[in-house]
């Protein structure tokens, strides 16, 4: 079969037959009319959030979403979670918390091998693990958190099913993690149809690949500006103006560190997280200034837009 014929059949299924080499600008926007927002990952507890808030106010940098407790919400007590929720509410930021830790904290070891990790390493193993992660989500919801990072498409499907049956809250953000490996328009369409409120594709896609993904989905896309050295460490600061133009609405996501496993650990000091968080806010300021200079029509949301799932305390 000719490649052009396959492209035609893909188009009939609602998927671009080629990557978007024309780099057509996106006309989609956030509800407030903005093209992009700022997401900070690795906000590991109240002390780190306090430093983030202090730094963003000094620099007058809006921060809209916090991917938080990446080492696992289980490791924080309810008072820490309440304090975190209170601070985020007062500064009008959405909190997306990471349930767990899960994988490698049970008996499964396949994911710890270089080849075994290719086989759905982020997915929850068995019904018991699904039950535990949902319980962890509800523990955080009960103290006011309304956003959660989902690392398993099966769990996302289950949560949406439970929502429809009235057994899981609907006033939440369900962000699909980069660990699910979304890397094509078909994968992006599946994420949207399963009920993700936003999703994080892999970090090293080209601009034409990204633009093709944007054509098929309306939900916000979470774009890695900078990520772990262990992920290859792609730094895409200077891609930001074009990404805002092509990929709107999008979150620019800042998560540089040596590795996820090493940095998101209860053995890493608050001081290390605080130092890096202040730098992340500085780099967000650079990105906003770069977009203003090169794509002045691409607007960033003000602090605290109304559609965020800000904690309820």
Task: Name each region found by the language model.
Residues 1-145, 150-182, 200, 207-313:
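Active-site pocket-lining/capping segments in soluble small-molecule metabolic enzymes
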Residues 194-197:
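Hydrophobic, aromatic-enriched interface-forming segments
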Residues 183-187:
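Short, glycine/polar-rich helix-capping loops at beta-to-alpha or helix-loop-helix junctions
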């Amino acid at each position: 079969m000719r490649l052009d014929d396959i492209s035609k059949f893909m188009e009939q299924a609602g998927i671009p037959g080629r990557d978007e080499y024309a780099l057509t600008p996106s006309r989609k926007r956030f509800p407030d009319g903005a093209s992009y927002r700022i997401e900070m990952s690795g906000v590991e507890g109240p002390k780190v959030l306090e430093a983030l808030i202090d730094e963003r106010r000094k620099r007058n940098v809006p921060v809209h979403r916090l991917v938080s407790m990446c080492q696992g919400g289980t490791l924080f007590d309810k008072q820490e979670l309440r304090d975190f929720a209170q601070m985020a509410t007062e500064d009008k930021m959405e909190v997306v918390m990471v349930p767990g830790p899960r994988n490698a904290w049970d008996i499964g070891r396949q994911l710890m091998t270089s080849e075994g990790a290719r086989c759905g390493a982020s997915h929850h193993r068995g019904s018991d693990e699904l039950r535990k992660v949902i319980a962890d989500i509800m523990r955080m919801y009960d103290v006011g958190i309304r956003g959660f990072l989902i690392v398993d498409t099966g769990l996302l499907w289950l949560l949406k099913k439970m929502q429809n049956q009235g057994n899981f809250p609907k006033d939440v953000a369900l962000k699909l993690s980069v660990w699910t490996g979304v890397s094509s328009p078909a994968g992006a369409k599946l994420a949207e149809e399963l009920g993700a409120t936003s999703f994080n594709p892999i970090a090293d896609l080209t601009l034409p690949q990204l633009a093709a993904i944007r054509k098929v989905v309306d939900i916000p896309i979470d774009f890695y500006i900078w990520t772990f050295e262990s992920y290859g460490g792609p730094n895409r600061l200077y891609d930001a103006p074009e990404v805002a133009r092509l990929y709107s609405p999008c979150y620019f996501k800042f998560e540089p560190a040596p590795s996820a496993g090493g940095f998101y650990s209860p053995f890493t000091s608050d001081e290390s997280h605080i130092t890096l968080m202040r730098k992340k806010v500085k780099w967000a300021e650079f990105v906003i200034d770069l977009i203003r200079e090169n794509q002045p029509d691409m607007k960033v949301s003000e602090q605290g837009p109304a559609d965020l799932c800000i904690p309820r305390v």
